[in-house]
From Swiss-Prot:
GO terms for cellular component: cytoplasm. The gene is ttcA. Belongs to the TtcA family. Pathway: tRNA modification. NCBIfam families: PRK10696.1 (NF007972). Its cofactor is Mg(2+); [4Fe-4S] cluster. GO terms for biological process: tRNA thio-modification. The lineage of its organism: Bacteria, Pseudomonadati, Pseudomonadota, Gammaproteobacteria, Vibrionales. This is tRNA-cytidine(32) 2-sulfurtransferase.
Length: 307
């Protein structure tokens, strides 16, 4: 880390506590990490994965359980990829790591159409390699650096372009059914991670080395959410809270809720015909410190749910 002013150091410490608190809360809520786990931390060289590794290292030191971390980077043989940066950085941390070399760049370039994105193909290839690597390393969990904004963006992408009310789960079983994938930063805001990574002075590696165009649908969603965040303070917090407070009886998916069996003897279900009552809506705080996590200080080091 470069030399910080006193004000910058105070801001860094505040951000670190916030991100660590939110990460610990997410880990506890979804039982992401258990005693004896070997966590494969996927390190791309971007701000999110650097922050995730940093926070997990800190939690490991103070956690009431024992777990191991191994950082894994996939060198996809993109022209100009600085192969020395991550090994040098990880050596300074003293963390176990592995760099996996696979030329997925050439495969993707063969499919690349000018002006189009091949991110989905690249992602599928990358996932397959990471799943294989996790098995080779004996990892029990695979940690990805997606944050709360990614989760909300994915939900709106599915709503607007896929016709599904579906987001990005904080914890899931991998596509091949062999691994548990976790997203420890699920409660963290991207804007906090950006500020934290800037102050931490991570050796960020550009994500556009492949030459592919950005996913414009996701970029449009991101811009929409950023606009809402500015114009309507608290809206982002409220939307994420909604993802944790689903009422299937008041949606329209008959595969999720048994509408067919409802009759007069069923009784009032989840408020009956009250679709929305503004009077009953809790006021959503603007600051993430008071939003979503509502952190209990007694849980600050308990990164697993022991009950």
């Amino acid at each position: 880390m470069s030399e910080l002013t006193k004000a910058q150091q105070q801001n860094f410490t505040k951000l670190q506590k916030k991100i660590r608190r939110n990460t610990g809360k997410a880990i506890a809520d979804y039982n992401m990490i258990e005693d004896g786990d070997r966590i494969m931390v996927c390190l791309s060289g971007g701000k999110d994965s650097f922050t995730m590794l940093d926070i997990l290292i800190g939690l490991k030191k103070s956690a009431p359980i024992s777990f191991d971390l191994i950082a894994v980077n996939l060198d996809q043989k993109q022209p100009g990829f600085p192969t020395h940066i991550l090994p040098e950085y990880l050596d300074t941390l003293g963390v176990e790591y592995r760099v996996v070399e696979e030329d997925t760049y050439s495969i993707v370039q063969d499919k690349l159409i000018e002006g189009k994105t091949t991110c989905s193909l690249c992602s599928r290839l990358r996932r397959g390699i990471l799943y294989r690597t996790a098995k080779e390393l004996g990892a029990t969990k695979i940690a990805l650096g997606h944050h709360r904004d990614d989760i909300l963006e994915t939900m709106f992408l599915n709503m607007f372009y896929g016709g599904k009310l579906k987001g990005m789960p904080p914890k899931l079983v991998s596509d091949n059914g062999e691994h548990v994938v976790i997203r420890p930063l699920a409660y963290c805001r991207e804007k906090d991670i950006i500020k934290y990574a800037d102050l931490a002075d991570y050796p960020i590696i550009p994500c556009n080395l492949c030459g592919s165009q950005p996913n414009m649908q996701r970029q449009n969603i991101k811009q929409m959410l950023n606009t809402w965040d500015t114009q309507f303070p608290g809206r982002i917090e409220s939307m994420f809270t909604a993802m944790q407070n689903v009422v299937p009886s008041h949606l329209a998916d008959f595969n999720t809720f048994d509408f067919k069996s409802i009759n007069r003897d069923s009784g009032v279900i989840n408020g009956g015909d009250i679709g929305f009552d503004k009077e009953e809506m809790p006021v959503q705080p603007v600051d993430i410190d008071d939003a979503v996590t509502e952190f209990d200080p007694s849980l600050k080091l308990d990164i697993v749910n022991v009950q």
